[in-house]
Amino acid sequence: GIRDFCLSRGLGDVYKRQGVGGNAGSLTLNASGGAGGSGGSSLSGKAGAGGAGGSAGLFYGSGGAGGNGGYSLNGTGGDGGTGGAGQITGLRSGFGGAGGAGGASDTGAGGNGGAGGKAGLYGNGGDGGAGGDGATSGKGGAGGNAVVIGNGGNGGNAGKAGGTAGAGGAGGLVLGRDGQHGLT
């Protein structure tokens, strides 16, 4: 769902929507978490943030992707939502959800990318979301960590105007590689 609110300012109303997080997976079945909603747009204020991805079920399943941040014409783009975590236990792979991308802005700052979700015991961490483009770019989100066996998620790229890229997530303790650092 999406949460709406309206702020009255002297020159008119500023309408903003904020993404709401995805539903969690079932606690007993192999269900994956739902994706987070995208943030709404804004003319001059900070746009709505993307909702966080839902966590996976207890045994199997992957985390949901974070929602993308909203676009802002003259303000700051919304931040991307965090990816949901993979399942806690079980013998099958549970991947972390990808982080949402930061929202763009024409004249303001881009939003920051969301962090990738942490993997379950087995599986890969989610990739971080890209930073939003703007006069100053948003930061890329960090990649999610793997736990026992699996690769860390890759860090998100910075926006086009430069900025800080996200760090890669750590690989699994037993087997797996670290995620790659995002590009600037």
Language model regions located:
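Single conserved hydrophobic/aromatic residue that forms the stacking wall/gate
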Residues: G1-Y15
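Long, distal/terminal scaffolding or interaction modules
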Residues: D13-T184
